[in-house]
């Protein structure tokens, strides 16, 4: 399940709507803190319609309490869902954000938002190592202006990371070795050619005998 799918599912929830009104600490501890690990992120924050952080939970990777701007929340109110990247003191963070609605409005087009739900994960060395394993590539997190020349021994693909205003804040540089070993293919080709020549020789030999 993707993080986008998760945040879509969790943000049409009557209990969450009620929490934005009551700001009940016990509810937050039971249903958000208690289930935090299942979200597979480093940060969850819930904001009210006043654009003020109600509460948060985070791993030790993210110590910054509030990195979401009022300007962004006003934009989120209109668009309902967003994914973007932002630079904070700890590094580059991938953010998933959605408005909060009751359970009878899964498409979020019948009711006004009750608040905002924010999930984030740090693009950390462990995150990159996992991505390297999945993609079989060497990956670097580099600044927005970084560039690297292609060479004949590898394929380099930059992935731009955009903020919510569509500005590049960083890049993930995927590099994969392009070492094609033609020796095996060459051996197979030689065998095929030899077999073909032998076939012709045998054919000519027997055709002469029967003439």
Stretches with model-predicted labels:
Residues 195-211:
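Cytosolic-side ends of inner-membrane transmembrane helices, especially those
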Residues 2-9, 34-53, 82-85, 114-123, ...:
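Short N-terminal helix-loop-first-beta-strand/juxtamembrane motif that initiates sensory/input modules
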Residues 17-29, 136-146, 175:
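Short, positively charged
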Residues 48, 162-163:
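Short, acidic, Ser/Thr-enriched surface-loop or helix-capping motifs
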Residues 57-59, 97, 173-174:
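Short clusters of small/polar residues that mark proteolytic maturation junctions
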Residues 79-83, 90-107, 115, 150-162, ...:
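A short beta-strand signature within small-molecule sensing/ligand-binding domains used
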Residues 2-71, 75-77:
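Extracytoplasmic/periplasmic sensory segments of membrane signal-transduction proteins
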Residues 130-132, 171-195:
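Membrane-interface helix-start motif
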């Amino acid at each position: 399940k993707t993080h986008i799918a998760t945040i879509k599912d969790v943000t049409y929830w009557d209990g969450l709507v009620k929490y934005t009104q009551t700001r009940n600490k016990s509810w937050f501890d039971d249903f958000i803190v208690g289930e935090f690990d299942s979200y597979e992120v480093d940060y969850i924050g819930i904001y009210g319609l006043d654009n003020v952080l109600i509460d948060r939970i985070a791993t030790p990777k993210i110590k910054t309490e509030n990195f979401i701007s009022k300007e962004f929340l006003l934009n989120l109110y209109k668009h309902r869902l967003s994914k973007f990247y932002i630079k904070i003191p700890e590094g580059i963070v991938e953010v998933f954000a959605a408005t909060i609605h009751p359970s009878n409005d899964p498409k979020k087009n019948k009711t006004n938002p009750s608040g905002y739900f924010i999930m984030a994960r740090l693009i950390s060395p462990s995150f990159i190592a996992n991505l390297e394993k999945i993609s079989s590539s060497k990956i670097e997190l580099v600044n927005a202006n970084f560039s690297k020349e292609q060479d004949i021994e590898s394929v380099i693909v930059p992935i731009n990371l955009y903020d919510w205003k569509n500005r590049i804040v960083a890049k993930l540089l995927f590099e994969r070795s392009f070492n094609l070993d033609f020796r095996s293919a060459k051996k197979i080709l030689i065998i095929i050619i030899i077999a073909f020549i032998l076939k012709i020789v045998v054919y000519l030999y027997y055709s002469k005998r029967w003439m």
